[in-house]
């Protein structure tokens, strides 16, 4: 199924919940908010990868969205999932797990991520869109890393 990334995203998002449960002997809104950040980040991240590596997925006969549903639909879903990050990124602040040291830069990083995902979406020439997908993919790695660094910095201050 082309939704394999969403389904698999559950497993990929569980480590913070499991780690939190082991460390605190409970599951809390903190671990759930970390789960949701990773869960909503995962589809756009992997669909960006699948856009510029579509030939490899085709050779391996892995039914990634660009192959089953086309490039335009994949770009739309990348944009949708990046936009879903906006409310999710507020959760740690809302539950008082983090403060403004986290929230302000996290919002700036997320808005920029939305912008570049929109830029990818609006590119209709597939050749250029595939090159742009690689850049968006690279940023998405940096993005998630910085979000978690912001948690650490915010909680140390």
Segments predicted by a language model, with ranges:
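Intramembrane alpha-helical segments
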Residues: 1-23
């Amino acid at each position: 199924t082309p939704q394999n990334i969403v389904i698999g995203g559950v497993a990929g998002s569980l480590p913070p919940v499991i780690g939190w449960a082991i460390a605190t002997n409970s599951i809390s809104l903190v671990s759930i908010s970390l789960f949701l950040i990773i869960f909503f980040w995962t589809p756009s991240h992997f669909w960006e990868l699948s856009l510029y590596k579509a030939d490899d997925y085709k050779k391996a006969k892995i039914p990634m969205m660009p192959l089953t549903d086309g490039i335009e639909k994949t770009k739309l879903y990348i944009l949708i999932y990046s936009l879903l990050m906006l409310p999710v990124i507020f959760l740690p602040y809302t539950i008082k797990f983090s403060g403004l040291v986290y929230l302000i830069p996290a919002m700036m990083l997320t808005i920029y991520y939305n912008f570049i995902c929109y830029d990818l979406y609006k590119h209709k020439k597939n050749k250029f869109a595939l090159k742009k997908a690689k850049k968006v993919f690279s940023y998405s790695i940096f993005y998630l890393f910085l979000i978690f660094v912001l948690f650490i910095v915010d909680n140390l201050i």
